């Protein structure tokens, strides 16, 4: 079974009280074993997103499972968009 490299754009929703914890969320994502790189980048109007590079095994439901685990990190994790995907 091969592996797939996926580059994600993870947006963080603005909480009602204060600003989002980009650093905390990025650190938690970085600690996931599939993640090779994780970086906070500017989006627009002072908002940021987290760019994630992950190496995932090939198979049915693996990509969806990874995305679900990222969503569970924090209630403010918004959209998770796969920007690029390729085989190793």
Question: Where do the PLM segments sit?
Answer:
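Long, contiguous binding/interaction regions
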Residues: 1-88
């Amino acid at each position: 079974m091969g592996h797939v490299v996926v580059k994600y754009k993870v947006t963080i929703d603005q909480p009602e009280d204060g600003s989002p914890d980009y650093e905390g969320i990025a650190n938690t994502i970085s600690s996931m074993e599939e993640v090779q790189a994780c970086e906070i980048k500017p989006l627009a109007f002072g908002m940021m997103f987290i760019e994630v590079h992950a190496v995932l095994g090939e198979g049915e439901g693996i990509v969806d499972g990874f995305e679900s685990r990222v969503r569970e990190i924090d209630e403010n994790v918004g959209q998770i968009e796969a920007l690029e995907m390729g085989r190793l």
